[in-house]
Amino acid sequence: GFNPCGETCQIDQTCHAPGCTCSIANICVRN
């Protein structure tokens, strides 16, 4: 399935998908 949080966030520490947050591993996950 499609993961709306599939982006990484090591560059600017932000996730552009709604309802997603940057994890410690610099991967966007659902919050």
Swiss-Prot record:
GO terms for biological process: defense response. Disulfide bonds join 5-20, 9-22, 15-28. This is Cyclotide psybry C. This is a cyclic peptide. The keyword Disulfide bond applies. There is a cross-link at residues 1-31 (Cyclopeptide (Gly-Asn)). The presence of a 'disulfide through disulfide knot' structurally defines this protein as a knottin. Belongs to the cyclotide family. Keywords: Disulfide bond, Knottin, Plant defense. It holds the Pfam family Cyclotide. The keyword Disulfide bond applies. Probably participates in a plant defense mechanism.
